[in-house]
């Protein structure tokens, strides 16, 4: 008989979905930007100069105010 496999590495902690929404009175608003390709249920990661979707890889660059003022 085959030996039983041991336990693999620990799982990464899951994200708290409640951090992505803000409740004010009776209204709920999203705090992060949604991916335009994947839809409203997929949030984009906010980096220094861009937004990135972890599901489809869509990138959207932020507009840099410093470069626009210089031109």
UniProtKB/Swiss-Prot annotation:
| Designated name of the protein | Small ribosomal subunit protein eS31
Where along this sequence does the record place binding of Zn(2+)?
35, 38, 53, 56
Tell me the disulfide pairings in this chain. Answer: none
Q: Can you tell me which family this protein belongs to?
A: Belongs to the eukaryotic ribosomal protein eS31 family.
Q: Which UniProt keywords apply?
A: Metal-binding, Ribonucleoprotein, Ribosomal protein, Zinc, Zinc-finger
GO MF annotation list: structural constituent of ribosome; zinc ion binding
Q: Cofactor: bound how, per the entry note?
A: Binds 1 zinc ion per subunit.
Kindly name one Pfam family recorded for this protein.
Ribosomal_S27
Report the stretches of sequence that form zinc fingers (C4-type): 35-56
The species this protein was found in: Methanococcus vannielii (strain ATCC 35089 / DSM 1224 / JCM 13029 / OCM 148 / SB)
Q: Per the UniProt entry, what are the Gene Ontology biological process annotations, in alphabetical order?
A: translation
Per the record's keyword annotation, is Zinc-finger included, yes or no? Answer: yes
User: Cofactor(s) for this protein?
Assistant: Zn(2+)
Quaternary structure per UniProt? Part of the 30S ribosomal subunit.
A single GO CC term, please? ribonucleoprotein complex
The answer to whether the entry has keyword Zinc is: yes
Question: What gene does the UniProt entry assign to this protein?
Answer: rps27ae
């Amino acid at each position: 008989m085959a030996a039983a496999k041991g336990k693999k590495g620990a799982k990464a902690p899951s994200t708290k979905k409640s951090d992505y929404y803000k409740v004010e009175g009776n209204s709920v608003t999203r705090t992060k930007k949604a991916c335009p390709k994947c839809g409203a249920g997929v949030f984009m990661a906010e980096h220094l100069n861009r937004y990135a979707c972890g599901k489809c890889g869509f990138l959207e660059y932020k507009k840099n105010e410093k470069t626009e003022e210089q031109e």
